[in-house]
Amino acid sequence: GYAPPYIANFERDPAVPTSNQDVELIMNITDYDGTVDSVAIAWSADDTVSILNMPIYTLPLSPGTTDEYEYEIPAQTDGQTVRYYIYAADNDGNESWWPVKPTAQTTPNVEFYTVRDNGMMVYDIQYTLNPNGSSPLAGQEVTVKGVVTSSTKIGDLGYLYIQDESGSEWSGIWCVGIGLNTYYR
């Protein structure tokens, strides 16, 4: 058939691991007009390794399921960024990637996370390797600490901004939501 394997319900747990936590990846992969022939993950904690040269590991079907695949990335050191992508092919040679790779693009896109022993930083929300500029934590509820640099109070900017104490690039964020008027700088 013409349809490639469909990768859905992707989960990474934990979203921001500590250096003593393995990271579990779980997803469902189905092929609606054939069978899933192979599933693999490429990952690296070495940012000098190009995406196309990352080691590749086969993902087995989870026992007792017909479409669930799992992989565990071993614990990494604090501050380490881990990049990865999932690849699936069906019996007709059709291919799929997670995250999605445009047809004309030769290099797969990657998901990534940074290991943090002292909790998430604003940098982890803002820094991205995604070509579309979206956060690696888009759609997830997160807790982050930061220094208030602007508040919603009268005489201030009227918006709540926080940043990491280090104040380097990617380290500031505009906060939206309920209860923001209780923060001061």
What are these regions (language model features)?
Residues 1-119, 135:
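Glycan-association/targeting regions that enable binding to alpha-glucans and other polysaccharides
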Residues 1-21, 106-185:
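OB-fold nucleic-acid-binding modules
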